């Protein structure tokens, strides 16, 4: 028997409308009734994952930001692993426009989400 199930959100736990449906709620409930632990691991921020946790009526640690953060159900950090500044600097030094691709640079700092300003301008003003 399984001791735990760890599920992603998008394309896994959430339906095509990016929401939790009754089937999923009932399935998670049955899993828990069997004594199997259930966790969420996602690339989303804590707040994006917490919304799903609340819909499932769970109080569990959430693995967020592609594994860079683990927070308890109240949002207190259990684990955090940030990129070192030297790697961030290398990422921001790349001339993405010369590559000719629509590359979006974004990241989290705590619970704040940041997107590079040029990308915002592109999507608002320049994209056909």
Regions found by a protein language model. Give the residues of each.
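Short loop/turn microsegments at loop-to-beta-strand junctions
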Residues: 1-3, 58-59
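Asp-based phosphoryl-transfer active-site loop
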Residues: 2-18
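Active-site phosphate-binding/coordination module
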Residues: 22-127
């Amino acid at each position: 028997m399984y001791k735990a199930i760890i599920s992603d959100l998008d394309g896994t736990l959430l339906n095509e409308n990016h929401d939790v449906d009754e089937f999923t709620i009932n399935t998670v409930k049955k899993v828990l009734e069997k004594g199997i632990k259930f966790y969420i691991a996602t690339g989303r921020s804590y707040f994006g994952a917490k919304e799903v946790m609340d819909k499932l009526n769970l109080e569990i640690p959430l693995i967020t930001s592609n594994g860079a953060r683990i927070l308890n159900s109240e949002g207190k950090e259990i684990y955090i692993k940030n990129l070192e500044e030297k790697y961030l600097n290398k990422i921001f030094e790349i001339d993405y426009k010369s590559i000719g691709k629509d590359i979006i640079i974004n990241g989290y700092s705590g619970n704040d989400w940041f997107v590079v300003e040029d990308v915002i301008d592109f999507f608002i003003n320049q994209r056909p």
